[in-house]
A protein has these predicted regions:
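Conserved cytochrome P450 K-helix/beta-meander segment immediately N-terminal to the heme-binding cysteine loop
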Residues: 85, 374-400, 479-482
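Cytochrome P450 I-helix active-site segment
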Residues: 6-16, 144, 148, 196-199, ...
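Cytochrome P450 catalytic-core helices
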Residues: 288-307, 311-313, 421-436
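Cytochrome P450 proximal C-terminal region
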Residues: 11-14, 41-42, 151, 196-201, ...
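N-terminal membrane-proximal hinge/A-helix region immediately C-terminal to the signal-anchor transmembrane segment
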Residues: 1-108, 119-122, 126, 145-153, ...
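Conserved cytochrome P450 K-helix E-x-x-R motif and the immediately C-terminal K′/meander segment
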Residues: 24-48, 234, 238, 321-362, ...
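Cytochrome P450 heme-thiolate monooxygenase catalytic core
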Residues: 2-8, 89-104, 108, 119, ...
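Cytochrome P450 heme-thiolate "Cys pocket" and heme-binding signature region
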Residues: 110-113, 117, 279, 322-326, ...
Length: 492
């Protein structure tokens, strides 16, 4: 029998636990990836391994991995996000599907979560070209009326002077928008079940039991996950076939993807590919936007002067109405606030890759198969790029024009998020309508901790009292506990 040895990962990092080995490091990273990695960057520099001994594998679908490397800084971001033939993307489903788990029950995992995140080289270029028409500006602009109607519906359900978990409200709102624009169905309508199942799948992200106990046994989260993917597979295939039979553009993203065709080759997306792309688009358009909105509303609740200036701008331009497409371009302060929020509290803090061949990064040799995590969050908090990096200062964006490798909440290079324009329009519409109508007052003495690996969300939500927009922005400032204070300067 021939024994295969993994190549040695010679990148600096902390030593193994003498008793438990790599396990404590993996658990700490899974519990709080930002809190785990930040001191490593401070100690070892911009390229650091999870452990100097290598052999870790956090998310890669590869059964064998030389180790996990974290990196940050504009030059390293440029290398990893630009050298596509060296740094491959892998599916959103990550290590939930590996060859050792191959079975009919795991078959749907091959399709969902793949999309543009899980294809590389020529296939990625070809698929991105097919998807682009669904995200051209004219097409995105056509979703404005649905976004406004759904936002208005959700806002009308809020009760004045009553507390709400604003994170939960934003998840519901973006779920409805994603379901309507992607599938053509709002919650409660035919076809919306796919969106509801996808939300439950997203909620299982970060469940350690799935990674450590990938066994299809009733009672285990992995078993529940496979059940959800089986349901989703059935629902989505039925929806795709109904739309194919109708052979019409219903105005939603899925309808357009079904009809997409390469002008030169006549190539269309297969049913499996449609499943993969819709899963990725839904996740990106739902969880990411929900967290960006939640963090922005929290930051405004703790920075009353900026909150007042933003509401003044909104009232001056919109006069209490929902924004038109043209008016969205006339809200410069709102855009700066969103940019600063997504810099400080990056909704997607990591960008994962795996090396397809041996390569060099930051002066270190990385073997083939090395898992590489680019820290978007850490790059956004480097003082050499952003003076006073923990300070919420939208004014910095009046003159500062970073490169795409210094500021990349939507990734960078040719793999920049295809739905970035959609997300920014959605966030602007929701904030402009909400802030004109309500003032959200933070309830003091909550513990606000970050949570998540793919996306960063408040672990226990954020409770706020819904007030009429009365301009009393100083109410509810202060009394914030938790590791949020490591990420942003706060009063009190």
């Amino acid at each position: 029998m021939t024994t295969t040895y993994l190549p040695k990962l010679n990148v600096p990092g902390p030593p193994l636990n003498p008793i438990l080995g790599r396990l404590p490091m993996i658990l700490r990273f899974a519990k709080d990836s930002i809190g785990y990695a930040r001191p490593l960057f401070e100690t070892y520099g911009f390229v650091v391994s999870m452990t100097a001994e290598g052999g870790t594998n956090i998310y890669s679908p590869l059964a064998k991995c030389p180790g996990t490397v974290f990196t940050c800084g504009a030059e390293n971001v440029r290398k990893v996000t630009s050298q596509h033939e060296i740094y491959y993307k892998y599916p959103l489903t990550g290590n939930m599907f590996r060859k050792r788990n191959d079975s009919p029950r795991t078959e749907p995992l091959k399709h969902f979560g793949v999309g543009l995140f899980g294809v590389n080289s020529g296939t990625h270029r070809q698929h991105r070209q097919l998807l682009m028409p669904a995200f051209h500006k004219q097409r995105i602009d056509s979703y404005r009326s649905d976004m406004v109607a759904i936002t208005q519906s959700v806002l009308e359900q809020l009760t004045i002077d009553k507390p709400v978990d604003i994170a939960q409200v934003m998840r519901l709102l973006t779920l409805r928008i994603a379901t309507k624009t992607l599938f053509g169905s709002d919650i409660g309508e035919e076809g919306a079940k796919s969106g509801q199942i996808l939300q439950e799948v997203s909620a299982m992200n970060g469940n350690l039991a799935i990674a450590f106990l990938p066994f299809d046994i009733p009672g285990l989260p992995y078993h529940r996950l496979l059940n959800l993917f089986a349901q989703l597979d059935d629902e989505m295939r039925a929806l795709i076939r109904r739309k194919q039979a109708n052979n019409t553009d219903d105005g939603d993203v899925l309808s357009m993807l079904i009809r997409a065709q390469d002008a030169e080759t006549g190539l269309r997306l297969s049913e499996d590919e449609l499943l993969g792309h819709t899963g990725v688009i839904f996740a990106a358009g739902h969880e990411t936007s929900a967290n960006a909105l939640t963090w922005t509303l929290f930051l405004l609740s703790q920075h009353p002067l900026w909150a007042q200036d933003v509401v003044d701008e909104l009232q001056s331009v919109l006069k209490g109405e929902a924004p038109t497409i043209e008016q969205l371009q006339k809200l410069p302060l709102l855009e700066r606030v969103i940019k600063e929020s997504m810099r400080l509290l990056t909704p997607v803090p990591w960008n994962g890759r795996v090396t397809s061949q041996a390569t060099e990064l930051g002066g270190y040799e990385l073997p083939k198969g090395t898992e590489v995590f680019v820290s978007i969050y850490q790059t956004h908090h480097l003082a050499e790029i952003y003076p006073e990096p923990e300070k919420f200062n939208p004014q910095r964006w009046e003159t500062f024009e970073p490169t795409m490798f210094e500021y990349n909440p939507f990734s960078a290079g040719s793999r920049v998020c295809i739905g970035a324009g959609f997300a920014m329009m959605e966030i602007k519409i929701v904030l402009s309508m909400l802030l004109q109508k309500y003032r959200l007052q933070y309830i003091p003495n909550q513990t606000i901790d970050r949570f998540g690996l793919i996306v960063m969300a408040p672990k226990n939500g954020i409770k706020m009292i819904v007030r009429k927009q009365d301009y009393n922005f100083t109410q509810g400032v202060g009394g914030v506990k938790g590791n949020i204070r490591e990420m942003v300067e706060l009063i009190g």
